[in-house]
Curated annotation (Swiss-Prot):
Record-stated family: Belongs to the folylpolyglutamate synthase family.
Protein's recorded name: Dihydrofolate synthase/folylpolyglutamate synthase
EC annotation from Swiss-Prot or TrEMBL: 6.3.2.12, 6.3.2.17
Co-factor: note: Binds 2 Mg(2+) ions per subunit.
Pfam families: Mur_ligase_C, Mur_ligase_M
Keywords, sorted A to Z: ATP-binding, Folate biosynthesis, Ligase, Magnesium, Metal-binding, Nucleotide-binding, One-carbon metabolism
Gene that this sequence comes from: folC
Binding residues annotated for Mg(2+) 1, in chain numbering: S82, E144
GO biological process terms, semicolon-separated: folic acid biosynthetic process; folic acid-containing compound biosynthetic process; one-carbon metabolic process; tetrahydrofolate biosynthetic process
Lineage, broadest ranks: Bacteria, Pseudomonadati, Pseudomonadota, Gammaproteobacteria, Pasteurellales
Annotated catalysed reactions: 7,8-dihydropteroate + L-glutamate + ATP = 7,8-dihydrofolate + ADP + phosphate + H(+); (6S)-5,6,7,8-tetrahydrofolyl-(gamma-L-Glu)(n) + L-glutamate + ATP = (6S)-5,6,7,8-tetrahydrofolyl-(gamma-L-Glu)(n+1) + ADP + phosphate + H(+); 10-formyltetrahydrofolyl-(gamma-L-Glu)(n) + L-glutamate + ATP = 10-formyltetrahydrofolyl-(gamma-L-Glu)(n+1) + ADP + phosphate + H(+); (6R)-5,10-methylenetetrahydrofolyl-(gamma-L-Glu)(n) + L-glutamate + ATP = (6R)-5,10-methylenetetrahydrofolyl-(gamma-L-Glu)(n+1) + ADP + phosphate + H(+)
UniProt source species: Haemophilus influenzae (strain ATCC 51907 / DSM 11121 / KW20 / Rd)
Enzyme class: ligase
Length: 437
């Protein structure tokens, strides 16, 4: 190890600091470096069955429901996802459990001893996850693509089933600035003669062409399967199966429906009872999540106010226009049942399309509190306010120096019947969650 001697027993924080500096570029897409190490360590086939999940939004919730279903079926399951909210350990789950620091540091040491050249943070962590999965002797692993697909580190593994959640404009510096270019990159996770499930209703031709080239069996939303909802429940069906009176769940319905489509291609005889149970159980932090009693009490203690005075508070990690569109639909439905204002606490990274986000949400948000995020990618609250007012000059917007400053300002102006939304980035939700968790 250059310039730094770390051991398996070194603290996890030291290892993560090393990983962040171990390659000259934080993001360096390509598979040659990581694949050579994976081949050396026999990590390309870590478990009998692999599902890879790609897409612009919805990957995390899709992975979570797949995981819940497979666990309820009695299988040994691992999940690799990113980014984490509070702790690195969230990125690797085995049997629905985060692993202790010691497991990660030992795995990092093993990878570091065997690497032949420098690796990026994500390459290093991907190899470590595969090593941990192989050691655990699992039945199934679910890999969440980090960025794009074709050149993403997770793509060194040949999956048996590929799932695409959605396709929209994001990460244009790396993936291209059109849906067609982005779809081509995401289709890089497809494998010859392996099934592909697509939850995006408007699929670019570049993705379909890639599937045809590889002779993939494709299951497309609204073509090969569909779902519909009413006030009390929802239904899902394809040409062979119809599931009726399904319970609503804590994740977006489109993602849940995509998972039900994916289940049809799994080599496991999963019962309808297991599917229904899993829909009722599934949840994931930061996905249009209302803050519940215990966390409301912690927030009230932090603020020094009576808990009963707090308004409804919702957190969401949505950070691009596609996610903002979904948010606006949820908030519009919610607004019909409340008497108060919609107040937003928004923090975003510099490389995100803030104007596209604002376009979807300004019609529904009454009051904005823009906050500064730290780090080299963080955007200041002043910059966000300037963007807001340049397009919507009459908007009510203020700037704060941190997420919690923004939350405090928002709550001072809020009354019991209002709704406060904390959103814009994983970083935004993480700062808030660290206070209430």
């Amino acid at each position: 190890m250059n310039n730094m001697q770390l051991k398996a027993t070194s603290p996890l924080a030291e290892w993560l600091s090393y990983l962040e500096k171990s390659h000259f570029k934080p993001i360096d897409l390509g598979l040659d470096r990581i694949k050579s190490v994976a081949e050396k360590l026999d990590l390309l086939h870590p478990v009998p069955y692999v599902i890879t999940v790609g897409g612009t939004n919805g990957k995390g919730t899709t992975c979570r429901l797949l995981e819940t279903i497979l666990l309820n079926h009695g299988l040994r399951v691992g999940v690799y996802s990113s980014p984490h909210l509070l702790r690195y350990n969230e990125r690797v789950r085995i049997q629905n459990q985060d692993l202790p620091d010691e497991a990660h540091t030992a795995s990092f040491a093993f990878i570091d001893e065997n690497k032949t050249e420098s690796l990026t943070y994500f390459e290093f962590s991907t190899l470590s996850a595969l090593h941990l999965f192989k050691q655990a002797k699992l039945d199934v692993v679910i890999l969440e693509v980090g960025l794009g697909g074709r050149l993403d580190a997770t793509n060194i593994v040949d999956s048996h089933l590929a799932v695409i959640t959605s396709i929209d404009i994001d990460h244009t510096d790396f993936l291209g600035d059109t849906r067609e270019a982005i779809a081509f990159e995401k289709a890089g996770i497809f494998r010859e003669n392996c099934p592909v499930v697509i939850g995006e209703p408007n699929v670019p031709q570049t993705m379909l062409d890639q599937a045809e080239k590889l002779h993939c069996q494709v299951a497309r939303r609204d073509v090969d399967w569909l779902f519909e909802q009413n006030a009390e429940n929802w239904q899902w069906q394809n040409k062979k199966v119809r599931l009726e009176n399904l319970p609503f769940c804590q994740i977006p319905l489109a993602n849940a429906a995509t998972v039900l489509a994916a289940v049809q291609y799994l080599p496991f005889d999963i019962s309808e009872q297991t599917l229904r149970k899993s829909l009722q159980e599934v949840e994931l932090v930061g996905r249009f999540q209302a803050i519940k009693t215990d966390k409301r009490e912690k927030l009230a203690d932090y603020l020094g106010v009576p808990v009963e005075t707090l308004p409804t508070i919702i957190v969401d990690v949505g950070h691009n226009p596609h996610a903002a569109k979904y948010l606006s639909e949820k908030l519009t439905a919610l607004k019909r049942s409340i008497e108060g204002k919609m107040i937003a606490v928004c923090g975003m990274l510099k490389d995100k399309d803030a104007n596209g986000v604002f376009e979807h949400l300004t019609p529904i948000i009454d009051e904005w509190h823009c906050v500064t995020l730290g780090g080299y990618r963080g955007q200041s609250g002043d910059e966000l306010v300037e963007k807001l007012k340049s397009h919507f000059p009459n908007i009510q917007a203020t700037s704060d120096n941190s997420v919690m400053d923004g939350v405090c300002t928002a709550l001072k102006s809020a009354v019991k019947n209002d709704v406060v939304l904390v959103f814009g980035s994983f970083h935004t939700v993480a700062e808030f969650w660290a206070v209430v968790e």
